Amino acid sequence: QLRYREAVLRAVDRLNEQSSEANLYRLLELDQPPKADEDPGTPKPVSFTVKETVCPRPTRQPPELCDFKEKQCVGTVTLNPSIHSLDISCNEIQSV
């Protein structure tokens, strides 16, 4: 069974794979995990913040050398690694 953080990191990897953006995202902040419970195959709510770098993915430049754009992501992940349930959406964080 995956830990909550591992499941979210997989979600960020999947987000990068499926993203139409030219740049990579990195996990910035992970909100509190749900209470430990029942079936690892049941989708769990998650909330986390990723930052998009301004560096293109093909350069493979270390993201920490790049400036960032920030997005807030919410959705669900499944902690059972054999079930690929992922429902994530991300929006630009509006500066106040």
Curated annotation (Swiss-Prot):
GO terms for cellular component: extracellular space. Keywords: Antibiotic, Antimicrobial, Disulfide bond, Pyrrolidone carboxylic acid, Secreted. The modification Pyrrolidone carboxylic acid is found at Q1. One of its GO terms (biological process) is innate immune response. InterPro entries: Cathelicidin-like, Cathelicidin_CS, Cystatin_sf. It is found in: Secreted. GO terms for molecular function: lipopolysaccharide binding. Residues 31-50 are annotated as: Disordered. It comes from the Eukaryota. Disulfide bonds join C55-C66, C73-C90. It holds the Pfam family Cathelicidins. Probably a microbicidal peptide. Belongs to the cathelicidin family. This is Cathelin. It comes from Sus scrofa. The lineage of its organism: Eukaryota, Metazoa, Chordata, Craniata, Vertebrata.
